[in-house]
Amino acid sequence: MPSKTDFTSSTMTPREIVQELDRHIVGQQAAKRSVAIALRNRWRRMQLPEELRNEVMPKNILMIGPTGVGKTEIARRLATLANAPFVKVEATRFTEVGYVGKDVEQIGRDLVDTAVKMYREQAKVRVRTQAEEYAEERILDVLLPRRSVGIGFDVDADVIRQEPSAHESETRAKFRRMLRSGELEEREIELDVAVNVSMDIMTPPGMEEMGQQLRQMFSNIGGGKSQKRKLTIKAARPLLIEEEAAKLVNEDEIRAAAIEACEQNGIVFIDEIDKVVKRGDTVGGGDVSREGVQRDLLPLVEGSNVSTKYGTIRTNHILFIASGAFHLTKPSDLIPELQGRFPIRVELDALSKADFIRILTEPKAALTKQYQELLKTEGVSLDFTEDAIDRIAEIAYLVNERQENIGARRLHTVLERLLEMLSYESPDRDGESVTVDADYVNAHLGELVKDPDLSRYIL
């Protein structure tokens, strides 16, 4: 059975987690620290005696800040760092029980699905060497069928198979060497491959779980069947390795370990939580439904049992991180019971011009670096001067101030507009070097920035 340590972030300290997040996200140190501490507390809890461990509840986090400042990006990067079952959901996709749409228990089911998939992949990695050996033997058996005796006798295959002669063993060893050196990759062979019955089933909104169950039922009907296919050895090898790995892993152990991982180390990120908050000065059916979603979320966050196709999970120790812009509402508009379940509040800062400059230059995959690498594929060398970076950041900041503040997402729009013609002409400019300076930026964007009406529609 996979060990619990497979799904914990025990090797990373809060400082290391923050440093890793710093490589991709500019600023927002308070949010990074809170997330890092929460992740480390998962490991700390697992070191406690079992009796005390069950009493230590996770401190859920509510991140508050305008759009485009890094809330969702923190969640995305967290998923790669957590090394634990992790799901990110949009609060707006859920509806109160009785309404058309997803119910909040789907969150628990999605978390278990994620964990089972992760554990299955880990298990397949562990048995891959053995699976490759079995796949190689199956290919050799097709290339060099082994002699058997006892035609018409109902006896065990091991009994009727003759020991290979010295010549056969030598030939098999020769083919094995050719197979491993890649000499036979394009050779066609005919072999039995397991049939995976798949069926597309369209279901109404909110009934996705039923669709999944029906698909699984139909796939089980064809389980165990195989069909003969002609494939090159190169194409057949990965299919056979996958088939052999699936035989070697223990599905029951995977499911049990996945449920354990969800209960002890699971993390749920709920985005756009402010969209299911009732505004203080409005009354209406929509607001009633929004409050209903909060009330449905409450038992999940407090701790309840959720039935999944793999078994029942308890949500008592799952860490919930919620985020929202709260433009038209405020955190105190959440129902009081739910407010109390998110004791850690973190406010993310709006981005300044200086932040935009850092976003364009510091992250490992900064936007400017992305455009440079994309155009390099066409043979165009692109370079940004410091004054160009400064001007791009200034334009993005000004447009955000004049119009809707969409944070760092404004940089995508500005850069795409700035480099539109270059991207269009780049296939015809192979071998050229292009330097983007402040004059280049003003020439392509200056008029748009001066005209507020025009920039409203284009930037």
Curated annotation (Swiss-Prot):
<keyword id="KW-0963">Cytoplasm</keyword>
<protein>
    <recommendedName>
        <fullName>ATP-dependent protease ATPase subunit HslU</fullName>
    </recommendedName>
</protein>
<keyword id="KW-0547">Nucleotide-binding</keyword>
<keyword id="KW-0143">Chaperone</keyword>
<dbReference type="GO" id="GO:0036402">
    <property type="term" value="F:proteasome-activating activity"/>
</dbReference>
<keyword id="KW-0067">ATP-binding</keyword>
<dbReference type="InterPro" id="IPR027417">
    <property type="entry name" value="P-loop_NTPase"/>
</dbReference>
<feature type="binding site">
    <location>
        <position position="26"/>
    </location>
    <ligand>
        <name>ATP</name>
    </ligand>
</feature>
<comment type="function">
    <text>ATPase subunit of a proteasome-like degradation complex; this subunit has chaperone activity. The binding of ATP and its subsequent hydrolysis by HslU are essential for unfolding of protein substrates subsequently hydrolyzed by HslV. HslU recognizes the N-terminal part of its protein substrates and unfolds these before they are guided to HslV for hydrolysis.</text>
</comment>
<dbReference type="GO" id="GO:0051603">
    <property type="term" value="P:proteolysis involved in protein catabolic process"/>
</dbReference>
<feature type="binding site">
    <location>
        <begin position="68"/>
        <end position="73"/>
    </location>
    <ligand>
        <name>ATP</name>
    </ligand>
</feature>
<dbReference type="GO" id="GO:0005524">
    <property type="term" value="F:ATP binding"/>
</dbReference>
<dbReference type="InterPro" id="IPR003959">
    <property type="entry name" value="ATPase_AAA_core"/>
</dbReference>
<feature type="binding site">
    <location>
        <position position="409"/>
    </location>
    <ligand>
        <name>ATP</name>
    </ligand>
</feature>
<comment type="similarity">
    <text>Belongs to the ClpX chaperone family. HslU subfamily.</text>
</comment>
<feature type="binding site">
    <location>
        <position position="337"/>
    </location>
    <ligand>
        <name>ATP</name>
    </ligand>
</feature>
<dbReference type="GO" id="GO:0043335">
    <property type="term" value="P:protein unfolding"/>
</dbReference>
<dbReference type="InterPro" id="IPR004491">
    <property type="entry name" value="HslU"/>
</dbReference>
<dbReference type="GO" id="GO:0008233">
    <property type="term" value="F:peptidase activity"/>
</dbReference>
<dbReference type="InterPro" id="IPR003593">
    <property type="entry name" value="AAA+_ATPase"/>
</dbReference>
<dbReference type="Pfam" id="PF10431">
    <property type="entry name" value="ClpB_D2-small"/>
</dbReference>
<dbReference type="GO" id="GO:0009376">
    <property type="term" value="C:HslUV protease complex"/>
</dbReference>
<comment type="subunit">
    <text>A double ring-shaped homohexamer of HslV is capped on each side by a ring-shaped HslU homohexamer. The assembly of the HslU/HslV complex is dependent on binding of ATP.</text>
</comment>
<dbReference type="Pfam" id="PF07724">
    <property type="entry name" value="AAA_2"/>
</dbReference>
<dbReference type="InterPro" id="IPR019489">
    <property type="entry name" value="Clp_ATPase_C"/>
</dbReference>
<dbReference type="GO" id="GO:0016887">
    <property type="term" value="F:ATP hydrolysis activity"/>
</dbReference>
<feature type="binding site">
    <location>
        <position position="271"/>
    </location>
    <ligand>
        <name>ATP</name>
    </ligand>
</feature>
<dbReference type="Pfam" id="PF00004">
    <property type="entry name" value="AAA"/>
</dbReference>
<dbReference type="InterPro" id="IPR050052">
    <property type="entry name" value="ATP-dep_Clp_protease_ClpX"/>
</dbReference>
